[in-house]
């Protein structure tokens, strides 16, 4: 018997799990009608032979920005085909396509130019973009998702795109930039700001009731009838509403809850599965975040994980003493205590730890903190870094010294 026969013969929960993923764009977007109409109005000159102003879309993660833009873009392409107009949309995720060269090469290749993804001078690629657009006479909407990532690493690409229309005769480009950061324009060069000529649309967070509507809509497409226990959707919506009204978080919670139920061979998705999903998502987020941290932040967290096994709360001074000793074991020079305080603030913002400033009376003030992550899970994630793997050899010694506050080897 095939090993999958038993799995496939069991009752299924999912009808189509892909509709719960971030990449899915639904046919309808509940509670974003105002933003859809606003964006459609701003892009409508494309269908009348004109060039719209550039558009910036702002809002926190999970507020429907990308889904709304892609929804309107799809409608724009459909309307242009009906009217037999030469209008195109090109989507670029600037977290992945993050250099001026790659942005321009991506655009050139979209319109038929055989530009390699590396190797040419950027100016040459820019000229190829112009030639490709002029050959086709295309009016293009360029969607730059996470545009703030591009601004930080390659703002000359944005400058090139903002000035390109003055060099085109038969075609044009409209930029639609999407960002979680409402202040990212503060980092733009003055020459880019002056050439942007942009409109802005702000996406507010969803509330619990709106998130519930979104989940109900997706659940009908994602699940077989009758597999969701009462209260599952409401709980997912309520938890996500606390996280700044994040629809992505709500959808992830519902999907992971169902996957947990599926793995447990349960025919229903229950409230208890949602609670397990919350813990799993938080752990996965923490592990992924830890993997991307610089080495000193990792050593700092390793120090905290050792102390916290017997002392859940600890101070900056206590952590710094252990941190310095670990730096010696890893073979890196320790940072100053002031810089370590900055790193602690960054870790606090990431949600890996929680810190408060407390008064020590005449001894001044210090920061008291506790880890929000399980120290064993945290240490396992940290030890994926080859530089920290050798610390396992000293774990017993380090724990003993950390817990006794005897910071000498």
UniProtKB/Swiss-Prot annotation:
Q: Name one Pfam family in it.
A: Cdc6_C
- InterPro entries the record matches: AAA+_ATPase (IPR003593), AAA_16 (IPR041664), Cdc6_C (IPR015163), Cdc6_lid (IPR055237), ORC1/CDC6 (IPR050311), Orc1/Cdc6_arc (IPR014277), P-loop_NTPase (IPR027417), WH-like_DNA-bd_sf (IPR036388)
Superkingdom as given in the UniProt entry: Archaea
SUPFAM superfamilies linked to this entry: P-loop containing nucleoside triphosphate hydrolases, Winged helix' DNA-binding domain
Q: Which CDD domains match?
A: AAA, Cdc6_C, HLD_clamp_RarA
Tell me the keywords, alphabetical order: ATP-binding, DNA replication, Nucleotide-binding
Q: Does the keyword ATP-binding apply?
A: yes
**GO MF terms, alphabetically ordered:** ATP binding; ATP hydrolysis activity
Q: Which GO terms describe its biological process?
A: DNA replication
Binding sites annotated in the UniProt record for ATP: 63-67, 206, 218
Q: Which family does it belong to?
A: Belongs to the CDC6/cdc18 family.
Biological role = Involved in regulation of DNA replication.
The name on file for this protein is: ORC1-type DNA replication protein 1
Q: Which organism was this protein described from?
A: Archaeoglobus fulgidus (strain ATCC 49558 / DSM 4304 / JCM 9628 / NBRC 100126 / VC-16)
Q: Which gene is this protein's source?
A: cdc6-1
């Amino acid at each position: 018997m095939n090993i999958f026969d038993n799995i496939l013969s069991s009752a299924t929960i999912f009808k189509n799990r892909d509709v719960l993923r971030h990449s899915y764009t639904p046919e309808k977007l509940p509670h974003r009608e105002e933003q859809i109409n606003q964006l459609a109005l701003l892009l409508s000159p494309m269908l009348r032979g004109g060039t719209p102003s550039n558009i910036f879309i702002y809002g926190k993660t999970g507020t429907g920005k990308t889904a709304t833009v892609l929804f309107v873009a799809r409608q724009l392409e459909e309307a242009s085909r009906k009217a037999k107009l030469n209008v195109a949309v090109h989507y670029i995720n600037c977290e992945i396509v993050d250099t001026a060269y790659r942005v321009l090469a991506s655009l050139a290749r979209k319109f038929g130019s055989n530009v390699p993804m590396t190797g040419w001078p950027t100016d040459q690629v820019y000229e190829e973009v112009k030639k490709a657009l002029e050959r086709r006479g295309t009016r293009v909407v360029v969607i730059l998702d996470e545009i703030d990532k591009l601004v930080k690493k390659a703002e000359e690409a944005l400058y090139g795109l903002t000035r390109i229309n003055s060099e085109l005769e038969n075609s044009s480009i409209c930029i639609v930039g999407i960002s979680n950061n409402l202040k990212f324009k503060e980092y733009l060069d003055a020459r880019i700001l002056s050439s942007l000529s942009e409109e802005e649309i702000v996406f507010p967070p969803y509330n619990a009731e709106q998130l519930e509507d979104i989940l109900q809509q997706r659940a009908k497409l994602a699940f077989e009838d009758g597999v969701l226990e009462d209260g599952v959707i409401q709980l997912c919506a309520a938890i996500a509403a606390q996280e700044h009204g994040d629809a992505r978080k709500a959808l992830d919670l519902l999907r992971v809850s169902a996957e947990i139920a599926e793995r447990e061979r349960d025919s229903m998705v229950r409230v208890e599965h949602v609670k397990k999903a919350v813990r799993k998502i938080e752990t996965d987020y923490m592990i992924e975040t830890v993997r991307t941290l610089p080495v000193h932040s990792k050593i700092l967290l390793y120090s905290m994980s050792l102390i916290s096994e017997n002392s859940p709360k600890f101070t900056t001074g206590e952590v710094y003493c252990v941190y310095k000793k670990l730096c010696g074991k890893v073979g890196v020079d320790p940072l100053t205590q002031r810089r370590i305080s900055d790193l602690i603030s960054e870790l606090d913002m990431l949600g890996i730890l929680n810190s408060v400033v407390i008064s020590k009376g005449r001894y001044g003030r210090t920061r008291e903190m506790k880890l929000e992550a399980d120290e064993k899970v945290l240490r396992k994630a940290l030890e994926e870094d080859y530089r920290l793997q050798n610390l396992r050899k000293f774990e017993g010694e380090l724990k003993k010294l950390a817990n006794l506050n005897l910071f000498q080897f």
